[in-house]
Amino acid sequence: MNIKTAVGAAFLGILWSSSMAFAFDTASKAPVGQSKRFFASEFGKTLPPVGYVQFCATNPEECKPRGGKKFKLAMSPERWNLIYQVNTYVNGKIAPVSDQDLYGEPERWVYPTDAGDCEDYLLLKKRYLEGLGFPPEALLITVVLDESNGGHAVLTVTTDGGDFILDNRRNDVLRWSDTNYTFLKRQSHSNPTQWLALVKQPTSNSGFVSGGTSR
């Protein structure tokens, strides 16, 4: 059993012991002719965040090319339940603390144990979901600008009903177009070290992810 499988099994134990439940959203399927609203457009290659490059240097096994094409996960009540529970559990488990306060540096991406910045939350959520059998091609680290034009990182789950966002600032799992964020870039489905722009024009704020600790 590898570490991700073990982590997923451990999370299932937590989930079952707490007897939590989440109702399946039957309206999550994208209506015919409206798919542009539910799926983010990609505009070619761009540079990854500095912190992610450093993360891959220390965790090369997490950043290996996967191959394959774009992946849209077929959703079910069970998968929705797991996505919601992972998001809620990690949001409650990890205290929001900036990298500057934790490590004395502006950005460091790590798997958190009890405290972390926005990117640390999503790394742990991604690890849990992969351990629960979710394909990594459907779990994409994503950089956005929030309502205050500050850098922030979230986890995108690409599904047959749209691109959904796991965010440390909310427990609700929303479609990307319902978040009020400006989406800048995210990982490629086939190679996590290659990033794709989600805006036509490059943004100077997209190199670092900061200000993502607030709820």
What are these regions (language model features)?
Residues M1-G8:
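Bacterial N-terminal signal peptides that target proteins for export
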Residues A21-R215:
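A structural boundary/capping signal
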